[in-house]
């Protein structure tokens, strides 16, 4: 099986990175090894053989994924997402989470099993509730 459960994220202000670290903490707490990596330092090839992984990205612009690095990465993942269990998470500063609903729809349409059928989102920096939700997401990933 997988040695590492990977969380790949893009973060501008550090909020989504904090969420990624909480997901990683949940994986570690469940007795598995976590790899929390910035999207700029990972290739989609590293996820192809994984049964489960998490992706994190904040809402950008008009409720879209970050277009320079994360969007192309997610587009590649769509090509092999069928049958994978994927956790999604990210922070937002405005709006109501439409970017995440769109992202969940994309991954589901590609055949992925999105954990809990929705992403973990929080406004601005993750509060205790958001950290707990991310940690729980990590525990779920570790069990796959």
Label each PLM-derived region with a short phrase.
Residues 1-4:
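Short, small-residue-biased leader/transition segments that mark boundaries at the very start
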Residues 8-10, 89:
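Short hydrophobic segments within beta-strands
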Residues 15-18, 22-39, 45, 49-144:
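FMN-binding flavodoxin-like domain, especially the glycine-rich phosphate-binding loop
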């Amino acid at each position: 099986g997988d040695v590492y459960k990977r969380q790949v994220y893009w973060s501008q202000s550090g909020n989504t990175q904090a969420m990624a670290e909480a997901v990683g903490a949940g994986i570690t707490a469940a007795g598995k090894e976590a790899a929390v990596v910035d999207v700029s330092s990972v290739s989609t090839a590293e996820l192809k053989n994984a049964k489960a992984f998490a992706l994190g990205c904040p809402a950008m612009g008009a409720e879209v994924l970050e277009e320079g690095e994360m969007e192309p990465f997610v587009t590649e993942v769509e090509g092999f997402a069928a049958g994978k269990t994927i956790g999604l998470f990210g922070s937002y500063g405005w709006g109501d989470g439409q970017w995440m609903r769109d992202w969940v729809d994309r991954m589901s349409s590609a055949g992925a099993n999105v954990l809990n059928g929705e992403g973990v989102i929080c406004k601005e920096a993750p509060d205790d509730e958001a950290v707990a939700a991310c940690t729980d997401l990590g525990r779920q990933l570790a069990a796959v």
